[in-house]
């Protein structure tokens, strides 16, 4: 790998570019220039309402990251005390790490090749009396088979918490991701289609979970009135964290959300053009089933084997075209192997895909 390439400007084609326009600058400037309410401003609740409406969910809570959103959701549902949570190993590591944050145990399950999401037909073999929830992940903007997973969760009385960090705007059978599961989390990190630099959100149809999440993200405090405009002492119902999104971040989220469908359409058009150009080669393109709407947060291909994948990866890097391996199996990370005695070979499809995938 060419270590001399270190900055995003050094790449002919970087990993991602952020779309921004004057509307972003204008609303952020408006928040800055008012000289107050950079925290707990009206933009936060407005963004929450807009996201909930966009995905057709009853409630939304914004936070400072997708990882905080996962952590807060587990806390809100009372997951902990060595409960078991079914998760993919083919994911970003916070999908599993956040389970450990609440003293629960991540149980790694294999994925299906068509969506790179959890294989619903394999979930039953991982259930025990301690299983509390299933946490599927939507890979790169492609929905997993969430409807089948939901059916399984309901049959087995398990919570369904969707790690949709990469999938805001995607849908399956006409249903927006964020409206199907008990709760869904989104990330607004820099490489997402809708980005605020950092940020996250949770959608749910449960009012009680919504109320718990608001306490968890802000010190366990009841904010019937803006904390910084209330001369009286606040009421604290529980312990909580400082996971709030700032007003400036929320303002950027509002303007980015207005452009989201346009950005998705551009990505889908670009993906189609790339597919037309590379389909003659010996590779597989990750597009998902016909009933799903892939937003192409990432464009990923599968090569024949690890050797070919690695050679292409290094070739692209030398040509200053950024490519990356999303993802290496979490269960083969040294920390998880040491802690849970996870081994090579236990998740054959995950391990196969991880050796072939290139983004």
PLM regions: where:
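PLP-dependent aminotransferase-like
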Residues: 75-164, 171
């Amino acid at each position: 790998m060419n270590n001399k390439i270190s900055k995003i400007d050094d790449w002919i084609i970087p990993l991602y570019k952020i779309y921004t326009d004057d509307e972003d600058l204008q609303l952020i400037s408006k928040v800055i220039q008012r000289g107050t309410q950079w925290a707990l401003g009206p933009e936060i609740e407005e963004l929450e309402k807009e996201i909930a409406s966009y995905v057709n969910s009853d409630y939304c809570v914004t936070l400072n990251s997708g990882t905080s959103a996962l952590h807060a959701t587990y806390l809100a549902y009372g997951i902990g005390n060595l409960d078991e949570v079914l998760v993919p190993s083919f994911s970003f590591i916070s999908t599993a790490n956040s389970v450990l944050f609440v003293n629960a145990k991540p149980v790694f399950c294999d994925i299906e090749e068509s969506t790179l999401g959890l294989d619903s037909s394999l979930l039953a073999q991982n259930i025990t009396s301690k299983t509390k929830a299933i946490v599927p992940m939507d890979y790169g903007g492609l929905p997993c088979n969430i409807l089948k997973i939901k059916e399984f969760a309901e049959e087995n009385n398990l919570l369904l918490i969707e790690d949709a960090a990469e999938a805001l705007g995607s849908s399956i059978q006409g249903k927006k991701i964020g409206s199907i599961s008990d709760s869904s989390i989104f990330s607004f990190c820099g490489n997402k289609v809708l980005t605020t630099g950092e940020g996250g959100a949770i959608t749910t149809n449960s009012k009680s979970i919504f109320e718990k999440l608001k306490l968890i993200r802000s010190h366990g405090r009841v904010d019937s009135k803006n904390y910084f405009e209330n001369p009286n002492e606040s009421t604290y119902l529980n312990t909580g964290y400082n996971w709030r999104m700032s007003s400036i971040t929320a303002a950027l989220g509002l303007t980015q959300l207005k452009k989201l469908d346009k950005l998705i359409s551009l990505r889908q058009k670009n993906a189609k053009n790339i597919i037309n150009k590379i389909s003659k080669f010996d590779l597989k393109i990750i597009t998902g089933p016909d009933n799903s709407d892939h937003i192409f947060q990432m464009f990923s291909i599968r090569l024949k084997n690890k050797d070919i994948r690695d050679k292409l990866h290094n070739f692209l890097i030398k040509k200053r075209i950024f490519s990356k391996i999303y993802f290496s199996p979490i269960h083969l990370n040294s920390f998880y192997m040491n802690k849970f005695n996870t081994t090579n070979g236990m998740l054959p499809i995950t391990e196969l895909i991880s050796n072939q995938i290139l983004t």
